[in-house]
Amino acid sequence: MDSKNQTAAMGILLTISAAHFLNDLLQSVIPASLPVLKEANALTFAEVGLITLTVQITSSLLQPFVGAVSDRHPMPAALPCGMLLSGLGLILLAHATTLPAILISVALIGCGSAVFHPESSRTAQDVSGGRRGFAQAVFQVGGMPAPRWDRSRRRLS
């Protein structure tokens, strides 16, 4: 890969890494908001557990299926679509006042994450220029600080 292509590839990798940070930051809002949601909506611990289960099922268990489809039919539009789904879920969560509305909101956040991760990882591999380990590492670094940043920010509040 020539210098110009390497620069472009690094730009794409850094953009995907930054998007990974934002995606994981959006998802880390859910556990941080559980105490507020519980109190504001008089939820039981079982209902809070259902919120957590919903986001885990949609974000984690859906990912392999999205990845399998992405392998056969690359979907570059999945990156912004995943971010939009997560963003929409977060906006809806901010206005949700019933358990079903909360569950739909967190399911959208989880689905957005499930759509974003496989395609963004595939894109990182595609622009790696044969440096797959490096490309994957740059992509992973973006997602690593989001939950930790959110936890440290909450401690300071």
What label would you give each PLM region?
Residues L34, A146-R155:
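Small-residue (Gly/Pro/Ala) motifs that create kinks and tight helix-helix packing interfaces
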Residues S105-G143:
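Cytoplasmic helix-loop-helix junction between adjacent transmembrane helices
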Residues S28, Q56-P64, P147-R148:
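Residue-level signature of mid-helix packing/kink "hotspots" within the transmembrane helices
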Residues L61-P100:
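Conserved MFS/SLC helix-loop-helix module at the cytosolic interface between two early adjacent transmembrane helices
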Residues I16, T98-V106:
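Short hydrophobic/alpha-helical segments at membrane-entry points of transmembrane helices
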Residues A8-A32:
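Pair of pore-lining "gating" transmembrane helices in MFS-fold secondary transporters
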Residues S33-S60:
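Extracellular/periplasmic helix-loop-helix junction of adjacent transmembrane segments
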